[in-house]
């Protein structure tokens, strides 16, 4: 959620375009772009979609309900910007769980090929629906354990620039990271290590507790 807030804080939406993977990551984005009442008042719950929705707001660019799509969609926006001489930031937000999808790999590959402004925010909380497994996740762990400094770096190997934020729940650390990459003229991955459920003790103690009914 903090990452979503920082995207809005340090971007000029809707000129700068933010694409959220799956769409549930976009709820704070919706709250900060004029739609908060739909989350606060039961009589207004049906006024917004559960997904990003261009017909609902100029801050939304796609109807997104599937995983692993944000990076590829953002590369399309970046290509369109470049063809029309634009200069806005294109930002893709994706979780580590979604990185295992093939379309995410395709998007990363094409972002490197474009070589122009694109900011790819990887929210790494070490969880998908359950724990992550596989070679990619071993490398993400190596990056976390080395504070982003290990020689083997999946993102750099694909031709992308890279910075690491060790405490992605630290608002000031996020502000500093986003200020460094705003208006950058090449594709860069901002790898953010976060704790899922930070601030709610039950969620912090049970990493598979992604939804709590009280």
Describe the predicted segments one by one.
Residues 19-22, 93-94, 119-123, 191-196:
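Short beta-strand segments
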Residues 172-211:
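Terminal amphipathic helices with adjacent charged low-complexity linkers/tails
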Residues 24, 125-127, 169, 194-199:
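Glycine-rich beta-alpha junction loops
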Residues 79-89, 134-177:
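Conserved thiamine diphosphate
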Residues 4-5, 9-114:
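Cofactor-binding active-site loop characterized by glycine-rich and histidine/acidic residues
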Residues 112-137, 143-145:
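Mobile "lid/hinge" segments at catalytic clefts and subdomain interfaces of large enzymes
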Residues 28-34, 99-108, 130-135, 141, ...:
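Short acidic, glycine/serine/threonine-rich loops at helix termini
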